[in-house]
A protein has these predicted regions:
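Periplasmic-binding protein-like
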Residues: 50, 127-134, 199, 207-244, ...
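A ligand-binding cleft/hinge motif common to bilobed small-molecule-binding domains
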Residues: 95, 109-117, 164-167, 189, ...
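Extracytoplasmic small-molecule ligand-binding "clamshell" domains
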Residues: 31-108
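Extended ligand-binding regions for polar small-molecule ligands
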Residues: 26, 69-78, 159, 228-266
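Ligand-binding clefts/hinges and TM-proximal coupling segments of bilobed small-molecule sensing domains
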Residues: 27-31, 160-175, 214-217, 246-280
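Flexible hinge/capping segments at coil-to-helix
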Residues: 35-37, 135-153
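Short helix-initiation/N-cap motifs at beta->coil->alpha
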Residues: 85-95, 140, 174-189
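C-terminal motif of bacterial Sec signal peptides marking the signal peptidase cleavage site
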Residues: 21-24
Length: 280
């Protein structure tokens, strides 16, 4: 009987060790190698759109540039790695993170709402708020967000802007990674009535295409926000390193140089405009 008891205890010990071994293997499988992978490959892969002026677009020399793009390039430079961009629409950029096709996404992504539940969010690289582009001739019949009911709102599907427009009763007209001139032309000719988006992006887009008769609706500003980069939830090590570099860029003035190049204003601090907070 004594021998049987001893054998039982041996079996329990062996089984316990086996379970611990399995647990260790499982922990190792979940190990965060997001930063070491980039360091070993010496390359950052960044998802962006290439159609969002002035955050991500092709210039006259056919070079991919823009505020978010240039910030990402500087991050890669300071990390001592090269950078490649993969171009998608908004849904594609988000999906590229979950599929592991990109290390992070850089495309004027807002850092508010439920986004933090699904992704890791970088340090803010821009403070902004939202506005509406309408026709010059008649303001598209819009004087407030309440007037969106029945109007045709243009944008990419599943964005916070389109969700907000829908909440106010707008009819959604969706585009797939369209260029700014297409968006603005469609508002001007009546195919659509309004575009909800980031104020600074809209301001620069309207200024860059002065022959298209559209404008930003004055004094109707809403949802103060911050923008930055998106990371997959599991990529904490890479996220933390990029955040370290972004803080360094803020401290030494490099981030200021980049945003003044594209926005001609200080987007490092919240605006002093009167801005309405609405639900998204």
């Amino acid at each position: 009987m004594e021998t049987i008891k001893i054998n039982k205890w041996k079996n329990i010990v062996i089984l316990g060790a086996f379970v611990m071994l399995l647990g260790a293997c499982g922990s190792k499988a979940k190990e965060d190698n997001s930063l070491s992978r980039v360091q070993e490959s010496k390359e950052l892969t960044v998802a962006t759109s290439d159609t969002l002026f002035p955050s991500s677009y092709y210039n006259d020399d056919n070079q991919l540039v823009g505020y978010d793009v240039d910030v990402a390039k500087e991050v890669a430079k300071r990390m001592g790695v090269s950078i490649q961009f993969k171009e998608y629409n908004v849904d594609g950029q988000v999906a590229s993170l979950t599929r592991g096709e990109a290390d992070f996404a850089a495309n004027d992504f807002g850092l508010s709402g439920d986004r933090g539940e699904k992704f890791r969010l970088s340090e803010p690289i821009k403070h902004s708020f939202d506005s509406m582009i309408v026709r010059k001739s008649d303001d598209s019949g819009i004087a407030s967000l309440d007037d969106l009911a029945g109007k045709k709102a243009a944008g990419e599907p599943n964005t916070s802007y389109m969700k907000l427009a829908e909440e106010y009763g707008a009819k959604l007209v969706t585009y797939d990674n369209a260029t700014n001139d297409q968006y603005l032309t469609d508002v001007a000719n009546g195919r659509t009535d309004v575009i909800l988006n980031d104020y600074y992006l809209q301001k620069m887009s309207v200024a860059a295409l002065p022959d298209i008769p559209v404008k930003i609706l004055e004094d109707v500003y809403f949802n103060p926000n911050e923008t930055g980069f998106l990371f997959a939830k599991d990529n904490q090590a890479l996220h933390d390193e990029v955040d370290r570099v972004l803080k360094e860029m803020k401290a030494d003035g490099t981030l200021k140089e980049i945003f003044e190049k594209y926005f001609q204003t200080d987007v490092s601090v919240p605006s002093d405009k009167e801005i309405q907070k609405v639900e998204k």
